[in-house]
Amino acid sequence: MESQKEARTLQEPVARPSGASSSQTPNDKERREGGAVPAAAALGAEADDDSADGLWELPVEPAERRPECTRCSRPQKVCLCPFLPAHPLHISTHLYIIQHPAEENKVLRTVPLLAACLPQDKCKVKIGRRFSEERDPELSTVCRKSGTLILYPGAEAANLEEFILDSPVYPSTIIIIDGTWSQAKDIFYKNSLFRHPKQVQLKTSISSQYVIRMQPTNRCLSTLECAAVALSILEKNNYIQETLLRPLQALCSFQLQHGAQIRLSKEHLLKNGLYPKPMPKNKRKLRKMELLMNSVKI
Protein backbone atom coordinates (compact mmCIF):
# COMPACT_ATOMS: atom_id res chain seq x y z
CA MET A 1 0.00 0.00 0.00
CA GLU A 2 2.78 2.46 0.87
CA SER A 3 4.56 1.82 -2.42
CA GLN A 4 1.31 2.41 -4.36
CA LYS A 5 0.77 5.73 -2.60
CA GLU A 6 4.33 6.81 -3.34
CA ALA A 7 3.93 5.86 -7.00
CA ARG A 8 0.67 7.81 -7.31
CA THR A 9 2.30 10.81 -5.69
CA LEU A 10 5.21 10.72 -8.12
CA GLN A 11 2.92 10.33 -11.13
CA GLU A 12 0.57 13.17 -10.17
CA PRO A 13 2.64 16.08 -8.78
CA VAL A 14 0.60 19.04 -7.64
CA ALA A 15 2.10 22.51 -7.90
CA ARG A 16 1.63 24.66 -4.83
CA PRO A 17 1.16 28.38 -5.39
CA SER A 18 3.92 30.65 -4.20
CA GLY A 19 3.30 31.78 -0.61
CA ALA A 20 0.69 29.07 0.08
CA SER A 21 0.66 27.41 3.48
CA SER A 22 1.97 23.88 3.82
CA SER A 23 -1.00 22.91 6.01
CA GLN A 24 -4.08 21.67 4.15
CA THR A 25 -7.74 21.68 5.07
CA PRO A 26 -9.80 18.57 4.13
CA ASN A 27 -11.32 20.48 1.14
CA ASP A 28 -7.87 21.46 -0.12
CA LYS A 29 -6.79 17.87 0.02
CA GLU A 30 -9.85 16.63 -1.88
CA ARG A 31 -9.40 19.22 -4.63
CA ARG A 32 -5.73 18.35 -4.98
CA GLU A 33 -6.45 14.64 -5.25
CA GLY A 34 -9.03 15.36 -7.98
CA GLY A 35 -6.69 17.50 -10.09
CA ALA A 36 -5.33 21.00 -10.27
CA VAL A 37 -6.43 23.60 -7.76
CA PRO A 38 -8.74 26.22 -9.31
CA ALA A 39 -7.02 29.55 -9.94
CA ALA A 40 -9.51 31.51 -7.82
CA ALA A 41 -8.98 29.20 -4.86
CA ALA A 42 -5.22 29.41 -5.26
CA LEU A 43 -5.30 33.20 -5.39
CA GLY A 44 -7.59 33.29 -2.34
CA ALA A 45 -5.27 31.05 -0.36
CA GLU A 46 -2.29 33.16 -1.38
CA ALA A 47 -4.07 36.36 -0.32
CA ASP A 48 -5.01 34.86 3.04
CA ASP A 49 -1.43 33.80 3.66
CA ASP A 50 -0.10 37.22 2.68
CA SER A 51 -2.48 38.92 5.11
CA ALA A 52 -1.54 36.48 7.86
CA ASP A 53 2.15 37.08 7.20
CA GLY A 54 1.52 40.79 7.60
CA LEU A 55 0.22 40.27 11.12
CA TRP A 56 3.60 38.97 12.23
CA GLU A 57 5.19 42.22 11.13
CA LEU A 58 2.99 44.38 13.36
CA PRO A 59 4.88 45.91 16.31
CA VAL A 60 4.17 44.32 19.69
CA GLU A 61 4.11 46.61 22.68
CA PRO A 62 5.38 45.06 25.94
CA ALA A 63 2.77 44.76 28.67
CA GLU A 64 3.21 47.41 31.30
CA ARG A 65 3.02 46.44 34.95
CA ARG A 66 0.63 48.42 37.06
CA PRO A 67 2.34 50.86 39.42
CA GLU A 68 2.96 49.16 42.77
CA CYS A 69 2.85 50.57 46.27
CA THR A 70 6.36 50.74 47.66
CA ARG A 71 5.23 49.57 51.10
CA CYS A 72 2.79 46.69 50.57
CA SER A 73 3.96 45.75 47.03
CA ARG A 74 0.36 45.66 45.81
CA PRO A 75 -0.91 47.58 42.75
CA GLN A 76 -1.69 51.14 43.80
CA LYS A 77 -5.39 50.77 42.96
CA VAL A 78 -5.69 47.91 45.46
CA CYS A 79 -3.18 49.16 48.02
CA LEU A 80 -3.48 47.44 51.41
CA CYS A 81 -1.60 50.07 53.42
CA PRO A 82 -4.79 51.19 55.25
CA PHE A 83 -4.83 47.72 56.83
CA LEU A 84 -1.17 47.79 57.90
CA PRO A 85 -0.08 49.15 61.28
CA ALA A 86 0.79 52.85 61.27
CA HIS A 87 4.25 51.95 62.56
CA PRO A 88 6.18 48.65 62.42
CA LEU A 89 5.40 46.34 65.31
CA HIS A 90 7.90 46.40 68.13
CA ILE A 91 9.32 42.89 68.54
CA SER A 92 12.52 41.46 69.99
CA THR A 93 12.50 38.27 67.87
CA HIS A 94 14.45 38.16 64.61
CA LEU A 95 12.52 36.56 61.74
CA TYR A 96 14.24 35.01 58.72
CA ILE A 97 12.09 34.05 55.73
CA ILE A 98 13.69 31.50 53.39
CA GLN A 99 11.76 32.09 50.17
CA HIS A 100 11.71 29.72 47.21
CA PRO A 101 12.48 31.68 43.99
CA ALA A 102 9.12 30.65 42.48
CA GLU A 103 7.29 32.57 45.23
CA GLU A 104 9.08 35.85 44.59
CA ASN A 105 6.88 37.01 41.70
CA LYS A 106 3.54 35.47 42.62
CA VAL A 107 0.76 38.05 42.60
CA LEU A 108 -0.94 36.95 45.83
CA ARG A 109 2.16 36.30 47.93
CA THR A 110 1.96 37.14 51.64
CA VAL A 111 5.61 37.82 52.54
CA PRO A 112 5.56 41.50 51.41
CA LEU A 113 2.59 42.11 53.73
CA LEU A 114 4.44 40.44 56.58
CA ALA A 115 7.61 42.45 55.97
CA ALA A 116 5.62 45.69 55.78
CA CYS A 117 4.35 45.12 59.34
CA LEU A 118 7.74 44.47 60.94
CA PRO A 119 10.94 46.49 61.42
CA GLN A 120 13.46 45.98 58.61
CA ASP A 121 16.17 44.89 61.04
CA LYS A 122 13.86 42.21 62.50
CA CYS A 123 12.55 40.65 59.29
CA LYS A 124 14.93 39.46 56.56
CA VAL A 125 14.01 37.59 53.39
CA LYS A 126 16.54 35.20 51.83
CA ILE A 127 15.64 34.02 48.32
CA GLY A 128 17.03 30.75 46.99
CA ARG A 129 16.90 26.96 47.12
CA ARG A 130 20.41 26.09 48.26
CA PHE A 131 22.31 27.77 51.08
CA SER A 132 25.76 27.12 52.48
CA GLU A 133 28.32 28.75 54.73
CA GLU A 134 30.22 29.96 51.67
CA ARG A 135 27.18 31.39 49.91
CA ASP A 136 25.54 32.97 52.94
CA PRO A 137 27.82 33.29 55.98
CA GLU A 138 25.23 35.44 57.79
CA LEU A 139 22.57 32.73 57.60
CA SER A 140 25.14 30.11 58.57
CA THR A 141 26.01 32.06 61.72
CA VAL A 142 22.32 32.48 62.58
CA CYS A 143 21.61 28.76 62.14
CA ARG A 144 24.42 27.79 64.52
CA LYS A 145 23.25 30.03 67.37
CA SER A 146 21.64 28.25 70.32
CA GLY A 147 18.68 30.64 70.35
CA THR A 148 17.62 29.93 66.75
CA LEU A 149 14.54 27.88 65.83
CA ILE A 150 13.29 26.65 62.48
CA LEU A 151 9.55 26.23 61.97
CA TYR A 152 8.91 23.02 60.04
CA PRO A 153 6.48 20.24 61.05
CA GLY A 154 7.64 16.68 61.51
CA ALA A 155 8.06 13.78 63.90
CA GLU A 156 11.17 15.35 65.44
CA ALA A 157 9.66 18.82 65.80
CA ALA A 158 8.78 20.10 69.28
CA ASN A 159 5.64 22.11 69.88
CA LEU A 160 6.68 25.75 70.05
CA GLU A 161 4.58 26.68 73.09
CA GLU A 162 5.86 23.73 75.11
CA PHE A 163 9.47 24.18 74.00
CA ILE A 164 9.84 27.77 75.20
CA LEU A 165 8.62 26.77 78.67
CA ASP A 166 11.49 24.32 79.19
CA SER A 167 14.23 25.84 77.04
CA PRO A 168 17.26 27.05 79.04
CA VAL A 169 17.92 29.68 76.34
CA TYR A 170 14.92 31.73 75.27
CA PRO A 171 14.70 31.78 71.46
CA SER A 172 15.83 34.99 69.79
CA THR A 173 15.44 34.00 66.12
CA ILE A 174 12.98 31.92 64.12
CA ILE A 175 13.36 30.73 60.52
CA ILE A 176 10.30 30.09 58.32
CA ILE A 177 10.37 28.59 54.81
CA ASP A 178 8.13 30.25 52.21
CA GLY A 179 6.92 28.14 49.28
CA THR A 180 4.56 25.31 48.40
CA TRP A 181 4.79 22.28 50.65
CA SER A 182 6.90 20.37 48.13
CA GLN A 183 9.20 23.39 47.71
CA ALA A 184 9.53 23.85 51.46
CA LYS A 185 10.31 20.15 51.90
CA ASP A 186 13.02 20.34 49.25
CA ILE A 187 14.62 23.38 50.90
CA PHE A 188 14.46 21.93 54.41
CA TYR A 189 15.93 18.51 53.65
CA LYS A 190 18.54 19.52 51.06
CA ASN A 191 20.24 22.24 53.09
CA SER A 192 22.45 20.93 55.89
CA LEU A 193 22.43 24.37 57.53
CA PHE A 194 18.85 23.78 58.63
CA ARG A 195 19.86 20.75 60.71
CA HIS A 196 21.46 23.07 63.28
CA PRO A 197 18.46 25.08 64.61
CA LYS A 198 15.94 23.43 66.89
CA GLN A 199 13.00 22.20 64.79
CA VAL A 200 9.60 23.32 66.09
CA GLN A 201 6.01 23.26 64.90
CA LEU A 202 2.74 24.98 65.77
CA LYS A 203 0.12 23.17 67.78
CA THR A 204 -2.99 24.98 66.65
CA SER A 205 -6.48 24.07 65.53
CA ILE A 206 -7.15 27.28 63.60
CA SER A 207 -8.00 27.04 59.90
CA SER A 208 -6.22 29.14 57.33
CA GLN A 209 -7.81 32.46 56.42
CA TYR A 210 -5.85 32.48 53.18
CA VAL A 211 -8.88 31.06 51.36
CA ILE A 212 -7.95 32.22 47.84
CA ARG A 213 -5.11 29.69 47.56
CA MET A 214 -5.51 25.93 47.89
CA GLN A 215 -3.76 24.25 50.82
CA PRO A 216 -2.94 20.52 51.07
CA THR A 217 -4.87 20.01 54.33
CA ASN A 218 -7.27 21.90 56.56
CA ARG A 219 -4.47 22.49 59.09
CA CYS A 220 -2.01 24.14 56.70
CA LEU A 221 -1.31 27.85 57.16
CA SER A 222 0.23 30.46 54.89
CA THR A 223 3.68 31.87 55.64
CA LEU A 224 2.18 35.07 57.05
CA GLU A 225 -0.17 33.10 59.31
CA CYS A 226 2.67 30.89 60.58
CA ALA A 227 4.73 33.97 61.39
CA ALA A 228 1.77 35.65 63.08
CA VAL A 229 1.11 32.69 65.38
CA ALA A 230 4.80 32.02 66.10
CA LEU A 231 5.65 35.66 66.88
CA SER A 232 2.60 36.05 69.12
CA ILE A 233 3.82 33.01 71.11
CA LEU A 234 7.45 34.11 71.31
CA GLU A 235 6.55 37.72 72.14
CA LYS A 236 3.67 36.64 74.42
CA ASN A 237 1.43 39.17 72.74
CA ASN A 238 -1.79 38.17 70.92
CA TYR A 239 -2.10 41.66 69.45
CA ILE A 240 0.75 40.77 67.07
CA GLN A 241 -1.27 37.94 65.53
CA GLU A 242 -4.35 40.14 65.11
CA THR A 243 -2.32 42.92 63.49
CA LEU A 244 -0.46 40.66 61.06
CA LEU A 245 -3.64 38.88 59.94
CA ARG A 246 -5.54 42.10 59.17
CA PRO A 247 -3.94 42.79 55.74
CA LEU A 248 -4.30 39.12 54.77
CA GLN A 249 -8.01 39.25 55.57
CA ALA A 250 -8.35 42.44 53.50
CA LEU A 251 -6.48 40.86 50.58
CA CYS A 252 -8.75 37.81 50.51
CA SER A 253 -11.90 39.91 50.94
CA PHE A 254 -10.96 42.15 48.02
CA GLN A 255 -10.15 39.20 45.74
CA LEU A 256 -13.43 37.45 46.57
CA GLN A 257 -15.37 40.63 45.81
CA HIS A 258 -13.77 40.78 42.37
CA GLY A 259 -14.36 37.25 41.13
CA ALA A 260 -11.99 35.01 43.06
CA GLN A 261 -13.38 31.77 44.46
CA ILE A 262 -12.86 30.22 47.88
CA ARG A 263 -10.30 27.45 47.44
CA LEU A 264 -11.04 24.49 49.67
CA SER A 265 -8.15 22.31 50.79
CA LYS A 266 -7.14 19.28 48.76
CA GLU A 267 -7.92 17.15 51.81
CA HIS A 268 -11.51 18.46 51.93
CA LEU A 269 -12.05 17.92 48.19
CA LEU A 270 -10.73 14.35 48.31
CA LYS A 271 -12.77 13.35 51.36
CA ASN A 272 -15.96 14.72 49.80
CA GLY A 273 -15.44 13.37 46.29
CA LEU A 274 -14.99 16.86 44.83
CA TYR A 275 -11.40 16.66 43.65
CA PRO A 276 -11.56 17.63 39.94
CA LYS A 277 -8.39 15.92 38.73
CA PRO A 278 -7.90 12.17 38.11
CA MET A 279 -6.03 10.28 40.79
CA PRO A 280 -2.30 10.05 40.01
CA LYS A 281 -0.79 6.85 38.67
CA ASN A 282 2.49 7.40 40.48
CA LYS A 283 2.42 5.15 43.57
CA ARG A 284 4.11 7.69 45.83
CA LYS A 285 1.68 10.46 44.88
CA LEU A 286 -1.26 8.06 45.13
CA ARG A 287 -0.19 7.07 48.65
CA LYS A 288 0.01 10.74 49.58
CA MET A 289 -3.54 11.28 48.31
CA GLU A 290 -4.78 8.32 50.36
CA LEU A 291 -3.20 9.78 53.50
CA LEU A 292 -4.97 13.08 52.87
CA MET A 293 -8.30 11.30 52.43
CA ASN A 294 -7.81 9.51 55.75
CA SER A 295 -6.71 12.69 57.57
CA VAL A 296 -3.27 11.25 58.27
CA LYS A 297 -0.65 13.91 58.93
CA ILE A 298 1.92 14.00 56.13
Swiss-Prot record:
Residues 35-45 have a biased composition (Low complexity). A motif (DXTW) lies at residues 178-181. It is an enzyme of class 2 (transferase). GO terms for biological process: RNA glycosylation; tRNA modification. GO terms for cellular component: cytoplasm; nucleus. Its EC number is 2.5.1.25. The modification Phosphoserine is found at residue 132. The keyword Phosphoprotein applies. It holds the Pfam family DTW. Keywords: Acetylation, Cytoplasm, Nucleus, Phosphoprotein, S-adenosyl-L-methionine, Transferase, tRNA processing. GO terms for molecular function: tRNA-uridine aminocarboxypropyltransferase activity. InterPro entries: DTW (IPR005636), DTWD2/TAPT (IPR039262). Residues 1-53 are annotated as: Disordered. The modification N-acetylmethionine is found at residue 1. The keyword Protein transport does not apply. It catalyses: a uridine in tRNA + S-adenosyl-L-methionine = a 3-[(3S)-3-amino-3-carboxypropyl]uridine in tRNA + S-methyl-5'-thioadenosine + H(+). Catalyzes the formation of 3-(3-amino-3-carboxypropyl)uridine (acp3U) at position 20a in the D-loop of several cytoplasmic tRNAs (acp3U(20a)). Also has a weak activity to form acp3U at position 20 in the D-loop of tRNAs (acp3U(20)). Involved in glycoRNA biosynthesis by mediating formation of acp3U, which acts as an attachment site for N-glycans on tRNAs. GlycoRNAs consist of RNAs modified with secretory N-glycans that are presented on the cell surface. PANTHER family: TRNA-URIDINE AMINOCARBOXYPROPYLTRANSFERASE 2 (PTHR21392:SF0). Belongs to the TDD superfamily. DTWD2 family. This is tRNA-uridine aminocarboxypropyltransferase 2. The lineage of its organism: Eukaryota, Metazoa, Chordata, Craniata, Vertebrata. The gene is DTWD2.
